[in-house]
Amino acid sequence: MKTTVLPNAEGRVLAAVDASVYGASVADHAAWAAARLGTSIDFLHVLDREAQPPTLTDMSGSLVLGAQETLLKELTEADAQRSRLNRERGRVLLQGAAERARTAGAKVAETRLRHDHLLDALVELEPGVRLFVLGKRGEHADFAKGHLGGHLERVVRAVRHPLLVASRAFKPIRRVMIAFDGSPTVLKGVEMLIASALLRGLPITLQVAGESTDTMRRAVIEVASRLEDAGFEVDAALTPGHPETVLAEAVRTQSIDLLVMGAYGHSRIRQFFVGSTTTALLRACQIPVLLLR
């Protein structure tokens, strides 16, 4: 295989934080990644336009003129107050995330407060990014139903750099599993990891879910050899069954701390958010997931 350089090797870690229970974990995962990569962190908080309630601006015919003018004035003042409080909350969130990361030993380059759509902000900032870090769910997600955050799918579809999806709580990353299907995306991802310091020195399991073919066995042997040549401790498993079931069980029984997988592709394991495979996997695995392009 030809060695691939990790995209934007000089870029920073960009971590998007909000008021969800994932905020602290995002900061912790970003600090871990930045330390491994030898880079700094930019923290981003977006005052999402979609989250702003509509302002009542046209009430002609519904109220007498004086009452309408009074109410419009009160609504304008309430809007201004809400905007001020949201900005202040955003600054507090960013300050808290930055302090948490610095306490963990990370270098924080910038904190960014944007009034924008999250996706637009991430795409605009991507040229300076080496790795994105987002929480699995945002502050508006339906936790009772276990839904993934509404932004996550759109972000994964749009960005071109690796994305670390933080779990609800951070714990030290000691063992890694790569969901391997022999596809070009995953093969390229392995080369990216070899070229990167992110997982260097960590033991890796190559986990294949589904039919064990001669072609797949050869691919596993080749990739395992490449990783071993790069200094990784590697083992491999080929397990029949549905990917979401096999991988979730393997993560649990082998005490895996980080799952690595390709974000897109035509095989069942990489049909991200098309059908239920990866959605079910992200919901079932209570660990961070590194998505590669």
Model-predicted regions and their roles:
Residues 116-119, 239-245:
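Conserved active-site histidine-acidic residue motif and adjacent donor-binding/catalytic loop
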Residues 1-3, 9, 22-29, 35-36, ...:
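Gly/Ser-rich helix-loop-strand patches that form or flank binding pockets
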Residues 30, 97, 122, 193, ...:
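Aromatic/hydrophobic pocket-lining residues that form π-stacking "cages" and hydrophobic walls in ligand
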Residues 75-99, 103:
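Alpha-helix-centered segments that form part of catalytic cores
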Residues 224, 242-252:
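A short, acidic, amphipathic alpha-helical segment used as a generic capping/interface helix at domain edges
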Residues 24, 80, 84-91, 187, ...:
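Electropositive phosphate-/nucleotide-binding environments in soluble metabolic enzymes
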